[in-house]
């Protein structure tokens, strides 16, 4: 038996439960069908065969889940941060224990190759560990002094939140959104994408088996137009974290406006990789190929526009074309596969249509550009490179979200910057140059939320993740995640410094509450009393008291 056959047999054993019992919603710790009994079918992009029947939640199901999240919120928010930390680490341990199952199910549900999905499960565990370690300090604030005033800030969880996750790398991206929400003390209603619902089900059951209380994490499957909309409009849901298309993000903002929803969006991208003639061309080519063709090109941070200095354009694109042609397209469970099938026939059709658009616009196909007859007859598309393109072409302006790279030449630094910024998106950028001064100058003006210099996308969890323009609102990562899931509260103590002699080092009884008086270096009393205008010991007014209100 080959390694591929062995992996397929394992995958079938992991998927058997879904084929037999389907995928139910999980609300308040219970498996439940949709309120009206509706279902939909999820298929594998490998062979287009059904994987499971999935409960199709709608407004009634979202309402039930939101009420469960609301009921669980007070106790979960009140749990000490150290206790939440321990529980989130238990969830991470449980993810690691089931990492193979998660990876194999994700491969068959999304078409992503095992080469990358084996790591994605472990990255999901690391997301939980990272935010678990920060849970005890999540509420910590600052002490801010002003003349006559001390301000103390703290943070409190915002309440029940909605999490809407995409079909690309759904397990890892779900952990990226859910782990900080739980660490902050929020309860959640999670609606995964309908194209890839299976690992979301694994994740919620892993969390509850690790000890997460009922109602803290609720899962409702369904379509965007019913379950998604009901979630974004529900009055008990205080915020929405969403990863997906920019157009959908705009719709969510409109739907949440009546209830003044806080929103955090990670949206589309048309990210440039800018290669100057002085760059290490071989390293830059490897990085460009990795950032567009890994994960099937179905990633928000993919470098889908290749901007190359004219003097090395032909040489560099030839290197990239040769590397693209050598990429193995195949079954996602084959250990050698880099590019597997695209997630769904609907998406495959979109990608193939864009390839035809590029050809009709006059761009040259230097590699790929065709449907591949892969194992199982699924949604396979070859790694594609367009050369001879310009920035006005649709393939250079619109997000394709597949293994399609568009290469455009530039004259000089100013031209490169103008081309890089001339799109509606601004998620990431990649810059390759040996000139450090140029790198600082260029990144200062590149319109992107994240930029990597002489590197592919290498994430460091404490750093901010997010885009500008049509690529998103807000930042994930580090403390930025807590800023979204928590409200900041300020408490101001107003006082005034006194210089008169009297009761130095004594104790005033103010309204029955003791307030100690200390001495400053000039011999005058300095204190913060707890009330204004009350009598002190022996009926005398306290020397120091709260200042008059402003």
Segments predicted by a language model, with ranges:
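Conserved C-terminal structural/oligomerization subdomain of aldehyde/semialdehyde dehydrogenase
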Residues: 49-53, 237, 274, 328-329, ...
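Hydrophobic face of amphipathic alpha-helices that form TPR/SEL1-like repeat modules
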Residues: 1-45
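Short, well-ordered beta-strand elements within core beta-sheets of diverse protein domains
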Residues: 50-57, 72-78, 162-163, 273-276, ...
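ALDH superfamily catalytic-core signature
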Residues: 239, 247-390, 414, 453, ...
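Rossmann-like NAD(P) dinucleotide-binding subdomain of oxidoreductase/dehydrogenase enzymes
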Residues: 96, 139-283, 410
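Alpha-helix boundary/capping motif
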Residues: 521, 533-535, 541, 545-549
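Glycine-rich loop-to-alpha-helix module at the N-terminal edge of alpha/beta enzyme cores
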Residues: 49-138, 148
């Amino acid at each position: 038996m080959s390694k591929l056959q062995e992996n397929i047999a394992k995958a079938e054993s992991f998927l058997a439960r879904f084929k037999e019992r389907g995928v139910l919603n999980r609300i308040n710790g219970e498996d439940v069908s949709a309120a009206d009994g509706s279902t939909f079918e999820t298929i594998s992009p490998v062979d287009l065969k059904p994987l499971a029947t999935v409960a199709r939640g709608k407004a009634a199901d979202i309402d039930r889940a939101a009420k469960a999240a609301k009921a669980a919120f007070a106790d979960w928010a009140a749990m000490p941060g150290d206790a939440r930390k321990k529980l989130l680490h238990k969830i991470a341990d449980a993810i690691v224990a089931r990492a193979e199952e998660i990876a194999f199910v994700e491969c068959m549900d999304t078409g992503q190759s095992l080469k990358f999905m084996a790591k994605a499960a472990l990255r999901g565990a690391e997301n939980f560990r990272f935010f678990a370690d920060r849970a005890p300090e999540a509420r910590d604030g600052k002490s801010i002094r002003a003349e006559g005033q001390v301000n103390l800030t703290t943070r409190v969880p915002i309440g029940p939140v909605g999490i809407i996750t995409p079909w690309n790398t759904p397990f890892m991206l779900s952990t990226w959104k859910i782990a900080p929400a739980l660490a902050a003390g929020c309860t959640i209603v999670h609606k995964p994408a309908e194209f890839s619902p299976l690992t979301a089900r694994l994740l919620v059951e892993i969390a509850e088996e690790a000890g997460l209380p009922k109602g803290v994490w609720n899962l409702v499957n369904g379509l965007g137009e019913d379950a998604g909309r009901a979630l974004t409009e529900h009055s008990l849901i205080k915020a929405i974290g969403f990863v997906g298309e920019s157009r959908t993000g705009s719709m969510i903002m409109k739907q949440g406006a009546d209830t003044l929803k806080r929103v955090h969006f990670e949206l589309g991208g048309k990210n440039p990789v800018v290669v100057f003639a002085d760059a290490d061309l071989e390293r830059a080519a490897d990085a460009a190929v990795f950032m567009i063709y890994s994960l099937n090109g179905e990633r928000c941070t993919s470098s889908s526009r290749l901007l190359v200095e004219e003097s090395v354009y032909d040489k560099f694109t030839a290197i990239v074309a040769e590397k693209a042609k050598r990429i193995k397209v195949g079954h996602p469970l084959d250990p050698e596969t880099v590019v597997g099938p695209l997630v769904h026939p609907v998406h495959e059709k979109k990608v193939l249509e864009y390839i035809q658009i590029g050809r009709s616009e006059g761009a040259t196909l230097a590699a790929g550009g065709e449907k591949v007859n892969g194992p199982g007859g699924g949604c396979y598309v070859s790694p594609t490179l367009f050369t001879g393109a310009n920035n006005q072409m649709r393939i250079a302006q619109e997000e394709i979200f597949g293994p399609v790279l568009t290469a455009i030449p530039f004259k000089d630094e100013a031209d490169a910057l103008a081309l890089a910024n001339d799109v509606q998106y601004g998620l990431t950028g990649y810059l390759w140059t040996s000139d450090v001064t140029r790198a600082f100058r260029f990144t200062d003006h590149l319109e992107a939320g994240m930029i990597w210099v002489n590197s592919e996308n290498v994430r460091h969890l404490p750093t901010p993740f997010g885009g500008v323009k049509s690529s998103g609102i807000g930042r994930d990562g580090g403390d930025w995640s807590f800023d979204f899931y928590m409200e900041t509260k300020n408490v101001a103590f107003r006082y005034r410094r006194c210089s008169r002699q009297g009761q130095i080092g004594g104790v005033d009884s103010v309204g029955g509450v003791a307030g100690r008086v200390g001495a400053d270096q000039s011999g005058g009393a300095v204190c913060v009393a707890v009330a204004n205008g009350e009598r002190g010991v022996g009926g005398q007014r306290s020397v120091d008291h709260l200042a008059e209100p402003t």
